[in-house]
């Protein structure tokens, strides 16, 4: 089953996993040490992230390391940029309104 990227990053545990492996590739066991959950639960989260192409697996000997798919993250960031600009404009307008209210 192919999952939606935003469905994948909606979960706080998966976002935390992304943050951890953004720094360095990690094994499921190493990742599981950062959470109060089972290794199996972490593996399920990893599977979802792999399905969405947010992370990839690299085999090193008998170990599997997970690392961030930087190109996919850039693609998401590029798509979000259009909304970032809209909200920056809205916040700027709100700042102007608040400044005018403060002057009154």
Please give the residue ranges for each predicted region:
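Charge-dense, helix-prone N-terminal extensions
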Residues: 17, 37, 55, 99-102
């Amino acid at each position: 089953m192919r999952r939606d990227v935003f469905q994948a990053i909606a979960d706080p545990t998966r976002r935390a996993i992304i943050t951890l492996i953004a720094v360095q590739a990690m094994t499921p066991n190493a990742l599981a040490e950062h959470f109060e959950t089972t290794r199996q639960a972490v593996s399920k989260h990893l599977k979802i992230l792999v399905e969405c192409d947010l992370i990839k697996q690299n085999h090193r000997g008998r170990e599997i390391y997970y690392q961030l798919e930087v190109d996919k993250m850039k693609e998401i960031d590029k798509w979000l940029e259009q909304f970032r600009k809209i909200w920056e404009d809205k916040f700027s307008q709100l700042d102007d309104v608040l400044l005018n209210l403060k002057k009154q």
